């Protein structure tokens, strides 16, 4: 059924055709299926960025317009010109609002989803932290011993009633027990340190010694005892030549370790001196980095004497063939002056680390040790005499003297200079029967019970 009405504005024809903007006439069917969707798409794109929000009245008008359009298509009848134009105008006003409202709704929905997720995430993190602090840090340890056996048995029964799935998870008290165990070990170590500090303070108080104000001591009595000991060692060395024999035997055992260009070494001179070391300026102080748990004695030592050893050997020239020639060498090295600060203290073996695996002896780890070392600011003066050659001899070559002095100082630093120490195990002072002795009496007369014949 065709419409007999003609639009007043010239856009609608009598036969039900529509005149577009360029003057072309199209049918209503083509307008609804082709031109109208394109027009709506353009309106949708323009309405993404502007337009008021959609109201309920706009939605109702859009629904009425859609229903009227469907009726027009089904009946193939156009409404009166004024009504249809009004519907088109309402459509042009309603669709941009609908599109803009939809886009605004989607934007607000996405913004709200992001804010909601952020808030939920922050709240979940806070809850996890609160749970961890409450149950893992401030909870009581389950490893405490319970004096009531009935409670222990009931707790055992309750634990046995748990399912295997719940037992597979680590209990929060597990971490708490580990933390408490470490805290107990640290507390025990602190108690031991406090006990040592208390013992040191007690000793200083009962011996009337103030580490801060006590003057340094001269150690004259100690010098006398050391002098007697050294004199006894010298007498034994002079009479029996024990030191020379032991040194030669030691060199013979180490002969295989000598380089191929050296012949056997022999001791020709040994001088153990005539004077004695002087110990002075002794002061007791706390050991560094001990926090008052250990005492040590600082003693100045001064030795002005001649300690000499002389050797002879041959330098073998093995080129172009072995034993082509040999060069005799005689060297005498003397220490004429030694000054240093000696550190002496009592300690245990477990307080220090050995420098080599060979020095570890499990039998010597018990008991106390006398530890001594020298400060790095020591002074050691040498006097070296050298003689090279058989007929044409070279005397006192400086290079030989410097080489010998370097090796001696290197040996001394690696063994006795801080931070290296030397340990001497102290014997047990507890009275024992095998250590009991008595003086030997001189017998002038013959033994009793034995007859004397004249």
UniProtKB/Swiss-Prot annotation:
Region (Disordered): 144-164, 434-454
Membrane-spanning ranges: 118-138
Keywords per UniProt: Endoplasmic reticulum, Lipid transport, Lipid-binding, Membrane, Transmembrane, Transmembrane helix, Transport
Lumenal compartment residues: 1-117
Localization per record: Endoplasmic reticulum membrane
Cytoplasmic topological intervals: 139-454
GO molecular function: lipid binding
InterPro entries linked: Mmm1 (IPR027537), MMM1_dom (IPR019411), SMP_LBD (IPR031468)
GO terms (BP aspect): lipid transport; mitochondrial genome maintenance; protein insertion into mitochondrial outer membrane
This protein's GO CC annotations: endoplasmic reticulum membrane; ERMES complex
S-S bonds: none
Pfam families: MMM1
Main subcellular location of this protein, as a coarse class: endoplasmic reticulum
Positions annotated to bind a 1,2-diacyl-sn-glycero-3-phosphate: 253, 411, 415, 430, 432-433
Membrane topology type: Single-pass type I membrane protein
SMP-LTD domain boundaries: 215-427
Top-level taxon: Eukaryota
Ranges annotated as biased composition (Low complexity): 153-164
Feature: compositional bias, Basic and acidic residues: 435-454
Entry's family note: Belongs to the MMM1 family.
Record remark on domains: The SMP-LTD domain is a barrel-like domain that can bind various types of glycerophospholipids in its interior and mediate their transfer between two adjacent bilayers.
Function: Component of the ERMES/MDM complex, which serves as a molecular tether to connect the endoplasmic reticulum (ER) and mitochondria. Components of this complex are involved in the control of mitochondrial shape and protein biogenesis, and function in nonvesicular lipid trafficking between the ER and mitochondria. Preferentially binds to glycerophospholipids such as phosphatidylcholoine (PC), phosphatidic acid (PA), phosphatidylglycerol (PG), and phosphatidylserine (PS), but not to phosphatidylethanolamine (PE).
UniProt subunit comment: Homodimer. Component of the ER-mitochondria encounter structure (ERMES) or MDM complex, composed of MMM1, MDM10, MDM12 and MDM34. A MMM1 homodimer associates with one molecule of MDM12 on each side in a pairwise head-to-tail manner, and the SMP-LTD domains of MMM1 and MDM12 generate a continuous hydrophobic tunnel for phospholipid trafficking.
Name by which UniProt lists this protein: Maintenance of mitochondrial morphology protein 1
Organism: Zygosaccharomyces rouxii (strain ATCC 2623 / CBS 732 / NBRC 1130 / NCYC 568 / NRRL Y-229)
Upper lineage: Eukaryota, Fungi, Dikarya, Ascomycota, Saccharomycotina
Gene that encodes it: MMM1
